[in-house]
Structures are given as C-alpha cells and as structure tokens.
Amino acid sequence: MISSNDFRPGVSIVLDGSVWRVLEFLHVKPGKGSAFVRTKLKNVQSGSVMEKTFRAGETVPQATLEKSTMQHTYKEGDEFVFMDMETYEEGRLTRTQIGDRVKYLKEGMEAEVIKWGDQVLGVELPKSVVLEIVQTDPGLKGDTATGGSKPATLETGAIVMVPLFISQGERIKVDTQEDKYISRE
C-alpha cells in the first residue's frame, strides 16, 4: 500500500484491477476543508489517461512491476519474439502490447519488458536508437524556407524530421520518447 502523500511521477498503483502510472501530481491544501492530491494517471495496459483526486493520506495498492532485459530476435506474423538474456527463454508480444514505440524496434535490439505478475504490460525501448535512413529528399543549398528540416523514413518504417544536410544511407540517432532527431552517427 502507498499513501497518496507519497505519489511521485513514475509510481505505479492498482485501481479497479488495472495498473496505472502517476504522470503528474499536485498536493492541494485549500484554506477551508481538508487537503487532497490531484493526479494525472496513465493506464499501463491501454495507454488511456485520466485525472483522479485522492484524499490526503488515502492509501491505495502499489503495483510491483518486474522489468527484465530481453532481446528482440525476430518478427513472426503480427507477433514480436523476444529472448530473455539470462534464461534464454522466448516470449511473444503483440503490436498492442509494445505500443506505438514499435516503429523503432529493430532485430537484435535490447528492451526492458515490464511484467505485473504473469501479465506482460509493455516494453520500454532505450531512450535513443541508431537507425539508417532509407529514404529522404535531397537537401538543396539555400532551401531553408521550410525551417531547415525535412521528413526521413528510417529502416524500421518510422518517419522523423531531420536537418537538410542529412542524406539517404546515413545513420542517425533518434530520441524514442520525443520522436526527434538527435545527431548523426
């Protein structure tokens, strides 16, 4: 059990049989009445976001999540096969279990698989990945009317905005959280 006074971003709690992660919290102490904690929660399974208010000091069950490092070995149909790096056991995850970050998933990449009991909740990819550009328009000298960036398609199918000097075939580092170009590799 965890008290609402101990909520911090990243803390996982159980509400109505689902795991929710605290995104934001605000401890409010009005001049009249009792204090309360206003939170913004994200459902780890579905990705939906809701706002919920708790009384100050109210206790809720805390979710104990297990993280294990697994390597993406191959894709079979609509399933992604991962291998546990310690036990060498294989596990299969669907596109919905991985979420929208699937566009950065590449064979041989290591990721943190998050489990709650026997249930797989999702996958945390590394903060940044290095991928090759398979298609982008050539950047013309003096063509900065569009803000100095252009779309580029990566080897995994993801599309990110890159500076004009980046060309097809180059390897770039991409922030998987913000969907942004970081640097050239």
From Swiss-Prot:
It is found in: Cytoplasm. SMART domains: EFP (SM01185), Elong-fact-P_C (SM00841). GO terms for biological process: peptide biosynthetic process. The keyword Cytoplasm applies. It holds the Pfam family EFP_N. Its main location: cytoplasm. GO terms for cellular component: cytoplasm. One of its GO terms (molecular function) is translation elongation factor activity. The keyword Protein biosynthesis applies. It comes from the Bacteria. InterPro entries: Elong-fact-P_C, NA-bd_OB-fold, Rib_uL2_dom2, Transl_elong_fac_P/YeiP, Transl_elong_KOW-like, Transl_elong_P/YeiP_cen, Transl_elong_P/YeiP_CS, Transl_elongation_fac_P. Signal peptide: none annotated. Belongs to the elongation factor P family. Involved in peptide bond synthesis. Stimulates efficient translation and peptide-bond synthesis on native or reconstituted 70S ribosomes in vitro. Probably functions indirectly by altering the affinity of the ribosome for aminoacyl-tRNA, thus increasing their reactivity as acceptors for peptidyl transferase. PANTHER family: ELONGATION FACTOR P, ELONGATION FACTOR P (EF-P) FAMILY PROTEIN. This is Elongation factor P. It comes from Nostoc punctiforme (strain ATCC 29133 / PCC 73102).
